[in-house]
Amino acid sequence: MKLTCVMIVAVLFLTAWTVVTAEPHSSNVLENLYLKAHHEMENPEASKLNTRDRCQRANFVCDAFHHAAVCCEGVCVLVCAW
């Protein structure tokens, strides 16, 4: 019984904490994401999702520290491998 009460109080506290610390203008955040996506549709060069032209071919030396070195095909295991 006591454990149940403690759990209920903890859940209520965490719910209240989430509501209090939530971002007050969350609709603006979604609007900004929409505007950014719309801009990227108009200007494909601005899109960060278009990384196909920056990928590395097979046998290219890659490591976990160079995030720009993405293998076009396969995975990075010290070198781009199939």
From Swiss-Prot:
Residues 1-22 form the signal peptide. Disulfide bonds join 55-72, 62-76, 71-80. It is found in: Secreted. One of its GO terms (molecular function) is ion channel inhibitor activity. Expressed by the venom duct. The keyword Ubl conjugation does not apply. Residues 23-53 form a propeptide. Belongs to the conotoxin O1 superfamily. The presence of a 'disulfide through disulfide knot' structurally defines this protein as a knottin. This is Conotoxin C11GB. It comes from Conus vexillum (Flag cone). The lineage of its organism: Eukaryota, Metazoa, Spiralia, Lophotrochozoa, Mollusca.
